[in-house]
């Protein structure tokens, strides 16, 4: 029997930690760490809402730290803890509904209802995550939002899902 070597959350953790590690290799700055944290907010939220809520205030205090390497080491450990919680349909649903709120001013009530139905269908296990993600990405292309476009959530999950379904993993 062909067993999966990594689950999807483990692959996300590998990608996320690799990117964080590269920040340090390329010259660590407060701005780079804040940008990283901002790009990964939805990924973090999908993995652990409680850890996400703890990490936010920690990051907000980055300017209090004299030694950026010490901050980085603490942050890295906290990200490891956060990402050790596997993402689950409940938390993905929360993320998708959060994103739906960003799109609300741009999509009409029929589109909102259709998106809500796709999200709910995913929540009930009737659709894969990729279905509501692709609809959201479609709306993001029609109604660009800089913050949403920068979210790694919309790159990493489809990449992992596609790798899984292509037989690479």
Language model features with spans:
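Acidic, Ser/Pro/Thr-rich low-complexity regulatory regions
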Residues: 2-169
């Amino acid at each position: 029997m062909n067993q999966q070597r990594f689950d999807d959350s483990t692959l996300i953790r590998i990608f996320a930690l690799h990117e964080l590690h590269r920040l340090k290799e390329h010259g660590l700055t407060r701005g780079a760490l804040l940008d990283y944290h901002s790009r990964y907010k939805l990924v973090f939220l999908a993995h652990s809402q409680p850890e996400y809520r703890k990490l936010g205030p920690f990051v907000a205090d980055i300017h209090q730290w004299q030694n950026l390497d010490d901050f980085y080491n603490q942050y890295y450990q906290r990200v490891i803890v956060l990402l050790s919680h596997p993402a689950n349909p409940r938390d993905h649903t929360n993320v998708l509904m959060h994103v739906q709120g960003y799109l609300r001013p741009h999509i009409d009530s029929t589109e909102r209802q259709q998106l809500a139905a796709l999200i709910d269908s995913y929540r009930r296990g009737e659709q894969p995550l990729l279905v509501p993600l692709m609809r959201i990405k479609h709306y993001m292309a029609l109604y660009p939002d800089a913050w949403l476009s920068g979210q790694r959530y919309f790159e990493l999950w489809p990449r992992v899902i596609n790798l899984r379904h292509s037989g690479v993993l």
